[in-house]
Amino acid sequence: MKSCLKMLLVAGAFAVSLAAFQDDALADTQLASWYGPGLEGNLTASGDVFEPYTEYTAASPYLPFGTDLLVTYGGYSVVVEVTDRGPYTGGRDLDLSAAAAEEIGLTYTGVDYVDVEVLN
């Protein structure tokens, strides 16, 4: 009985810590940049045609393709879909399409921290 109670306590503690980790993964501040010039019409890692000036998309090194993100910067927000891998410059977490970056004003600074929330 005592060992059963200990197992329940350990399992409960694990479940609580896992839930906290998942919540942290849903909203985060990440270093973002943008990309697009010279890449229009190329295939993304997911197989989609890259349309940087008309579509709100993003590249992430680890989020699954099809993940929708709410990206906020300077009081402006945009919803993007992860369709590509990258960025490939050290320290950056997210690459936004030119259209998405322009929507929130990131094209002026080029690289900056943004708030990111996973929507699905």
PLM regions with names:
Residues 2-8, 14, 18-120:
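Secreted/periplasmic proteins
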